[in-house]
């Protein structure tokens, strides 16, 4: 199993009772996670001093409760910069566990000894797109959501990769 342990700006701090406590840069968020089935004490002080909490509705969906959280902020993974903003269905705009995949294919791209082209489908906000572009690949980023494509362009600009994907 690969572990995404190279993050400096993201960590899972604790988890219990269907929720996880995460640090995204300097902000602490509580989000539901159906995989968290254990019921351990929520002793970490972050549970009480969170910046945002996504509350799932019994009817489906849910909503964010913001305690002290900007509309948008940035986190970094190695040389990449991501713009985060909580939006519907508990998302923040990034799946940090995917960093292991980014590292794997970035190494393959750098060591290929030839030009590499990548087609990133369902590309969301561009984590994989940016990692491949930063490693030297020519990338085509495709997502059905115009908003996600715009967000990926923002992330590319923040990472100094506007001319790449």
Give short role names for the model-derived ranges:
Residues 141:
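Short beta-strand "acidic-cap" motif of Rossmann-like dinucleotide-binding folds
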Residues 125-138:
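Conserved SAM-binding loop of SAM-dependent methyltransferases across substrates and taxa
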Residues 96-113:
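Conserved alpha-helix/loop element of class I SAM-dependent methyltransferases that forms part
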Residues 1-4:
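N-terminal accessory targeting/assembly segments
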Residues 145-165:
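S-adenosyl-L-methionine
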Residues 18-19, 109, 128-129:
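A generic local secondary-structure boundary/capping motif
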Residues 6-22, 29-96, 103:
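Non-catalytic substrate-recognition/targeting regions of SAM-dependent transferases
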Residues 115-124:
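Conserved class I S-adenosyl-L-methionine
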């Amino acid at each position: 199993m690969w572990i995404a342990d190279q993050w400096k700006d993201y960590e899972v701090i604790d988890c219990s009772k269907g929720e996880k406590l995460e640090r995204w840069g300097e902000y602490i968020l509580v989000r539901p996670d159906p995989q968290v089935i254990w019921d351990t004490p929520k002793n970490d002080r972050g549970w009480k001093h969170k910046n945002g909490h996504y509350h799932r509705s019994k009817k489906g969906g849910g909503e964010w409760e913001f305690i002290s959280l900007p509309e948008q902020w940035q986190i970094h993974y190695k040389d990449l910069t991501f713009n985060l903003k909580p939006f519907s269905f508990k998302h923040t705009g990034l799946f940090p566990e995917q960093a292991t995949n980014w590292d794997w294919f970035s190494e393959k791209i750098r060591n290929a000894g030839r030009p590499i082209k990548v087609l990133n489908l369902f590309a969301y906000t561009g984590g994989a797109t940016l990692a491949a572009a930063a490693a030297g690949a020519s990338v085509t980023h495709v997502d059905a959501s115009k908003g996600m494509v715009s967000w990926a362009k923002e992330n590319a600009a923040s990472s100094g990769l506007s001319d790449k994907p």
